[in-house]
Structures are given as C-alpha cells and as structure tokens.
Amino acid sequence: NLLKREVAKYLPKWEKTTGLYCSSWQSKYMTTKWGTCNPTSKKIWLNLQLAKKPIECLEYVVLHELAHLKVHDHGPEFTAILDQYMPYWREHKRRLNDSTLDYLPSQLE
C-alpha cells in the first residue's frame, strides 16, 4: 500500500540521518495518535491514516517516534532532537493536530 511504500523510503532516511534505528515497524488504524513506539523493543507503529496526509507530516511522525527511542518524554532533550533534524517540525505537528482522525465502527468490535 501507499503508506508502506512511503515508510520504506523515509524511515531508512531518518534512521541514517539520526543514527536512531527501530527494530521493526507496523501500521494500524488508531483513533487518538498518529504514531507510537515501544522504546524497549524499538518497535514503531504508524497510523494508517498518515497515507492521506502530506509527506512532510509522515516524515515528522517517523522522526518523532525515532526520537522516542532515545528520549521517552517530550521534554527539552526530545524537542532538541526534533529541532536539530527538522527545524519546521512544529508546523507539521500543528497541521496534523488541526486535522481529524477518522472514526471506524469496526474498532468497537
């Protein structure tokens, strides 16, 4: 699918750029988050709905989750990583936060 192709392109780019590597990644529908990760297992999950967003937003979420592999909270050290590698990350975050996540009835089943 489109998201898998885009992640296959951009995840290695950001891993190489930051030196932060995930063990694996998966996509799934999420109703409250664009991405999540498990720093212990170094696994990343990306919201399937990112396929419908501008590529810059996908790159931001990939970088955001990779940064969590090093820093677990959203404090100054975390934002410094984002600032270093993506100076306009706040704009991409705002763009995502201003958009909606789709509700899928099947999520209740």
Spans of features found by a protein language model:
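Walker B catalytic acidic pair
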Residues: 65
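Active-site-proximal or metal-binding-adjacent scaffold patches in catalytic folds
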Residues: 1-60, 69-109
